[in-house]
Amino acid sequence: MKILENNKINLSLLNNYILQPKIFEKGTDKFWDDEHISEQMLNLHLNPDIEAASKTKETIDTEANFIIKAIDMKKGKKVLDLGCGPGLYVREFAKTGATVTGVDISERSINYANENIKPGYDNILFIKKNYLDINFRESFDLATLIFYDFCALNTSEQIALLSKIYEALKDNGYFIFDIVT
């Protein structure tokens, strides 16, 4: 059912979209595939001047360069970017020659990344998947979770994700994430 159908507004459906969720209330994956929401989220990701769905271009460049230097990212390294959105960090990591896998739940973001970030790079793979459902084994030198995603998870999801990331990392691998304090 759509909010606007046959020139009529479905007020109860509209109300569902404007209700503020309780803290750590479980949402649905369908949120990310809603045509209007996913389009607006992608537009926000791609706006280099505001921090709404992604960080500003200047911040992305600064953080990516810090991460690249901190782990000596180069060809032969394998990187997992969880919640990669349209691949803004993936692109920066791939420039080093590292093999980079980006995972995101939004089909629109993954499609954008495949069409606009991946061309010219044979060392990038984008996967449309909820990162809570990943199952990699000792594959990566680095896993990242950027833009405060960890804070949006409830405690059991945080524990489950940390376990999955631990399994995905090689011995002595790194997990870099940011939180709001």
Language model segments and positions:
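N-terminal auxiliary segments of SAM/dcSAM-dependent transferases
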Residues: 2-32
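Conserved SAM-binding loop of SAM-dependent methyltransferases across substrates and taxa
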Residues: 86-97
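Conserved SAM/SAH-binding beta-strand->alpha-helix loop
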Residues: 106-108
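Conserved SAM-binding loop
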Residues: 113-114
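Conserved SAM-binding strand-loop segment of SAM-dependent methyltransferases
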Residues: 119-132
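A short acidic, Gly/Pro-enriched loop at the edge of an enzyme's catalytic core
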Residues: 135-142
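A short glycine-rich, Lys/Arg-flanked "PGG" loop and its adjoining helix->strand segment in the class I
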Residues: 159-171
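Conserved beta-strand signature within the Rossmann-like core of class I S-adenosyl-L-methionine
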Residues: 172-179
